[in-house]
From Swiss-Prot:
Cell compartments where the protein resides: Cytoplasm
GO molecular function, one term: metal ion binding
Active site: 129
Record function comment: 3'-to-5' exoribonuclease specific for small oligoribonucleotides 2 to 5 nucleotides in length, as well as small (2 to 5 nucleotides) ssDNA oligomers. Probably responsible for the final step in mRNA degradation.
Gene3D superfamilies, sorted: Ribonuclease H-like superfamily/Ribonuclease H (3.30.420.10)
UniProt binding sites for Zn(2+): 12, 14, 163
Listed name of the protein: Oligoribonuclease
InterPro entries found in the cross-reference section: Exonuclease_RNaseT/DNA_pol3 (IPR013520), Oligoribonuclease (IPR022894), RNaseH-like_sf (IPR012337), RNaseH_sf (IPR036397)
Domain Exonuclease, residue spans: 8-171
Organism: Escherichia coli (strain K12)
A Pfam family it matches: RNase_T
Gene: orn
Amino acid sequence: MSANENNLIWIDLEMTGLDPERDRIIEIATLVTDANLNILAEGPTIAVHQSDEQLALMDDWNVRTHTASGLVERVKASTMGDREAELATLEFLKQWVPAGKSPICGNSIGQDRRFLFKYMPELEAYFHYRYLDVSTLKELARRWKPEILDGFTKQGTHQAMDDIRESVAELAYYREHFIKL
């Protein structure tokens, strides 16, 4: 293991909703790949404690999804708050990628970055300002080569580490079938 500026940091958050002014992070996971999308290491998957009052603000979709996955119970049982989760994630990332080198990688990653900016600003600042957003390729494929879209299916567990692994696999799929490298 050594920090390499070409490695990519992949991240996914599960939140109580989509508005960082009202909602909170309830799960964070990261993994690191090399430039060829080979997974080098998986970071900690952390349920971030939130109060019962905060959890009660979730809409029906979030309650159903995060209860079915067991995340609500893990959040209630967790002793890690935003700052502890942020520090544990940074400790992992520093082993693999120097600060400011990796774009933030994932699916619809701009949404996650909004929450990081508000609740985990030190972690948000660890990333390069650029984004590697797999959903951009999906949108381009939908418009320019829709016949390839059915070739990749997500499980959609809405568990952070599962979602990241799927994002890496989805980018590899688009690299082969859309970009054709």
